[in-house]
């Protein structure tokens, strides 16, 4: 990775694309703050650096959530994009362009790359068997299949791995699998899929992996995958699917992970067209520009295996570096909704200054992939000690004397040139740390300098000298040195705390805090009246933030409930005879129509087809089922229940559903092959 500041570099930087299906939380923010700090540093050094990102807007999950909310996928991704961009702005993440993978630019680039791979013989097709939801009419990804783990017997596990024992398996091995979408039993069906022939690029990838493009830990993991053998990569999904249709393949769509990284190109092209930048000068194979992807270690497979091979096969340049980071833990544990440590960006910003978090992350970030722990007690003490107690303290101790004794103007000469020069020269080592993404090391060096500046002021004790007649100039000289040291520290901290740096720039009455500006002394220079640049972290607000982040039911209680099982809270009823049971006439019905009931917050009006007649039933399932998701679905009803007159009409029976203490409702579905009107016995 280049480190020189003299030669102007052309750099394109990306962060992983957040999925347009949920809110930004502190775990996400680690990556965007890390990237933003690095980009701000590069711009401060005078390089041409562009930072682009986009919402990852395709896939089954987007389609299903939009259906659940009763809006189109386009409306959903537009809404989520606005939320994401507002969150990023709160935390000072300054993209040069923020876009969407659901764009015409991304469609064009996806088709161009796919066509290039296809024409070069790197795409194959073959039939595969998959789980199919007969109710929803779609093929199911592994995460949309749940059942009992075949290894340990734990229930409610996903179709590819068990969260209880860690086992991996195929959906076909899952015991009693069901669709997590409809609850139906999946069917095995065959479909033609398109594959990217990754093994064609084995030699190229061996060289790329060894080329210094990833961290050593990531290289070792890639080599493990490499040595275990490359498989072809399934890049297609069947309709219905929200995404881009594959050229010349009706009903087949690009898998979301194919067009997601291509979204980097699309977002950059959108920026290029707006700003007049030469797109090809960054992406052609012989480009001298640098391209860096910042990602989490959980998506290395896509970015460091498939992505470079795709680019190579399409005749484009590959990334200069793929920089991976670890996960965020809070107080030494996985982020938890019940403990209030699963904290959304918006919730944090309602209680605390986002720059606290930017600094804390920087103070702990290295170039490695270890997880970063946000210890809330340490968070408060470190921010208070470093930013407030050390850095801001320098300016606050000196500014008043400059105002009083120098009429707001610094001394005309520097009383400590060697000290100031040492601070200026320290910038090269700090810059090297920033460049290498060793932010924690850079922050330690900055705080060591802050300690030295405070020690200088404490040793000179201008507040004591100010009481002695005739020493006014000496006091002004000391405090002018202090202000200059503060200015240099803010140059070094500007990438980390840009809002605080902007306030400091206003206070110092200077045009820039760019890296080279540290070399210019402020002499006989007017400064503004000092205002507090940062207040201390209020631990009561931390407590309020975590309380606001909690869910009503604690996670620990849920685990206890799961361990006990539903029978502990809802014991089996008194025994009945067979004759009592035989009185119930249970029938298979098809939900022909489902409607909201005006004035009823809990009810849906269901029109049920019994295969020869229809019934109207009012059911209290509105909270969990959208009407359009129910129509066409088979369920079970009590057909001989006496009609019940309600305020909204007459209910002619009852549909059957299971429920739990948390308010969950699970409508019963018969096995495949059942028909309306059949008796359940």
From Swiss-Prot:
Stored Pfam families: Anticodon_3, tRNA-synt_1g, tRNA_bind
Cofactor mode of binding and number, as noted: Binds 1 zinc ion per subunit.
Entry keyword set: Aminoacyl-tRNA synthetase, ATP-binding, Cytoplasm, Ligase, Metal-binding, Nucleotide-binding, Protein biosynthesis, RNA-binding, tRNA-binding, Zinc
Family matches, as PROSITE patterns: AA_TRNA_LIGASE_I, TRBD
GO CC terms: cytosol
Motif 'KMSKS' region, residue range(s) on this chain: 334-338
Quaternary structure, from the entry: Homodimer.
Protein name as catalogued: Methionine--tRNA ligase
Cell location: Cytoplasm
Binding positions (ATP): 337
Reaction catalysis annotation: tRNA(Met) + L-methionine + ATP = L-methionyl-tRNA(Met) + AMP + diphosphate
Enzyme Commission no: 6.1.1.10
Species of the source: Chromohalobacter salexigens (strain ATCC BAA-138 / DSM 3043 / CIP 106854 / NCIMB 13768 / 1H11)
GO molecular function: ATP binding; metal ion binding; methionine-tRNA ligase activity; tRNA binding
Domain tRNA-binding residue range list: 580-681
CDD domains in the record: Anticodon_Ia_Met (cd07957), MetRS_core (cd00814), tRNA_bind_EcMetRS_like (cd02800)
Amino acids binding Zn(2+): 149, 152, 162, 165
Function: Is required not only for elongation of protein synthesis but also for the initiation of all mRNA translation through initiator tRNA(fMet) aminoacylation.
Family: Belongs to the class-I aminoacyl-tRNA synthetase family. MetG type 1 subfamily.
Gene name of this polypeptide: metG
Known cofactor(s): Zn(2+)
């Amino acid at each position: 990775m280049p480190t020189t500041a003299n030669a102007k570099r052309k750099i394109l930087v990306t962060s992983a694309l957040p999925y347009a299906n949920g809110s930004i939380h502190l775990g996400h923010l680690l990556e965007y703050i890390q990237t933003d700090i690095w980009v701000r540093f590069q711009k401060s050094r005078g390089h041409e650096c562009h930072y682009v990102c986009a919402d990852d807007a395709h896939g089954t999950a987007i389609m299903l959530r939009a259906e659940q909310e009763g809006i189109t996928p386009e409306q959903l991704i537009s809404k989520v994009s606005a939320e994401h961009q507002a969150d990023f702005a709160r935390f000072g993440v300054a993209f040069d362009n923020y876009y969407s993978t659901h764009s015409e630019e991304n469609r064009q680039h996806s088709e161009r790359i796919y066509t290039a791979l296809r024409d070069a013989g790197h795409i194959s097709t073959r039939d595969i068997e998959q789980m199919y939801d007969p109710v929803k009419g779609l093929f199911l990804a592994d995460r949309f299949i749940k059942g009992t783990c075949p290894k340990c017997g734990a229930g409610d596990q996903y179709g590819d791995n068990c969260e209880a024992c860690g086992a991996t398996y195929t959906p076909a091995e899952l015991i009693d699998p069901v669709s997590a979408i409809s609850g139906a039993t999946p069917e095995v069906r065959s479909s033609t899929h398109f594959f990217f022939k990754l093994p064609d690029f084995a030699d190229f990838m061996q060289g790329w992996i060894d080329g210094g493009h990833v961290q050593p830990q990531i290289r070792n993991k890639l080599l493990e995958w490499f040595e275990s053998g490359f498989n072809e990569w399934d890049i297609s999904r069947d309709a219905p699917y929200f995404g881009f249709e594959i050229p010349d393949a009706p009903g087949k769509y690009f898998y979301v992970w194919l067009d997601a990284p291509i979204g980097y190109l699309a977002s950059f092209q959108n920026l290029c067209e707006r700003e007049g930048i030469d797109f090809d000068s960054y992406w052609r194979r012989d480009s001298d520009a640098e391209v860096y992807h910042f990602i989490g270690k959980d998506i290395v497979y896509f970015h460091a295996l498939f992505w470079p091979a795709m680019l190579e096969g399409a005749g484009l340049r590959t990334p200069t570096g793929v920089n991976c980071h670890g996960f965020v833990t809070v107080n030494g544990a996985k982020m938890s909704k019940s403990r209030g440590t699963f904290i959304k960006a918006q919730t944090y910003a309602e209680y605390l200054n986002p720059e606290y978090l930017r600094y804390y992350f920087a103070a702990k970030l290295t170039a490695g992939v270890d997880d970063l722990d946000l210890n809330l007690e340490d968070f408060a003490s470190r921010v208070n000690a470093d930013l407030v107690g050390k850095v801001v303290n320098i300016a606050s101790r000196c500014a008043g004397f400059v105002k009083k004794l120098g009429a707001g103007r610094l001394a005309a000469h520097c009383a400590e040139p060697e000290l100031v020069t040492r601070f200026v020269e320290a910038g090269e080592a700090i810059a090297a740390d920033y460049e290498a993404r060793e932010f924690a090391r850079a922050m330690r060096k900055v705080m060591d300098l802050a300690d030295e500046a405070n020690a200088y002021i404490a040793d000179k004790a201008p507040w004591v000298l100010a009481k002695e007649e005739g020493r006014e100039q000496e006091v002004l000289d000391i405090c002018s040195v202090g202000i200059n040291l503060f200015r240099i520290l803010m140059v070094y901290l500007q990438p980390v705390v840009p809002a605080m740096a902007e306030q400091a720039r206003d206070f110092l009455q200077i045009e820039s805090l760019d890296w080279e500006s540290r070399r210019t002394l402020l002499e006989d220079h007017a400064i503004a009246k000092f205002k507090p640049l940062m207040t201390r972290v209020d631990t009561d607000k931390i407590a309020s933030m975590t309380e606001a982040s909690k869910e009503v039911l604690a996670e620990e209680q849920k685990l206890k409930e799961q361990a006990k099982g539903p029978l502990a809270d809802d014991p089996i009823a008194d025994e009945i005879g067979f004759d009592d049971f035989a009185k119930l006439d249970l029938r298979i019905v098809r939900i022909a129509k489902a409607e909201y009931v005006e004035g009823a917050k809990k009810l849906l009006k269901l029109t049920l087809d019994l295969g020869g007649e229809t019934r109207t039933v009012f059911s209290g399932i509105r909270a969990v089922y959208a009407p359009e998701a129910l129509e066409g679905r088979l369920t079970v009803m009590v057909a001989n229940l006496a009609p019940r007159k309600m305020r909204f009409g007459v209910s002619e029976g009852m549909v059957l559903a299971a429920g739990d203490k948390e308010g969950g409702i699970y409508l019963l579905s018969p096995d495949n092959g059942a028909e309306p009107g059949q008796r359940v016995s």
